[in-house]
């Protein structure tokens, strides 16, 4: 499975493609430069020429994938298939998904990725690998800097979705006394969703599932139903 590296345009992309395949096959702990070289159709020595070690290469791989994601949402507003899984071609005749639908996909991908199908379903093995990589940020500054940037990129994407979903939602009725409920900053909602997703991914990859999946989704869905009508939809100047 090559994902976004099916047709590399240069040596860097070919090496990153080899790293992508090796990482999915072996996982973070067992992947080595040698195993990455085994997936490379040129001399493995080129890998050592371009990168100081495994982590240097994997951080560059994550940066490339994040660049691809950022470009895709800038161009079309829709994210690409996560991890380049065996996804189906996008059905152009299918109804356009609402912002709320996109939020549902994002949240489900975090706590139950295997339940999704279709063109934008995440690849469950890739989700596991990304969780392994995020764990490296606890002790490695290069990984930490990458995930700081990743959180910013996904946060901007979610902010747009939350604003659009809020605009699609009917405003709440005023209280009996005539006062409207206080508004909720969009940044607060985005931070809540990102924290839910990050924690959900870690729990999904490190447990055998259970009632917590449905219970957590019910909880976050209830939160969104309550909070979306209160979100400030106007962007700050």
Where do the PLM segments sit?
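Extracellular/lumenal glycan-associated context and N-glycosylation machinery
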Residues: 128-131, 169
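Short loop-to-helix capping motifs
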Residues: 136-141
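Hydrophobic alpha-helical connector segments
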Residues: 60, 74-127, 186-193
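Helix-turn-helix
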Residues: 3, 8-14, 18-64
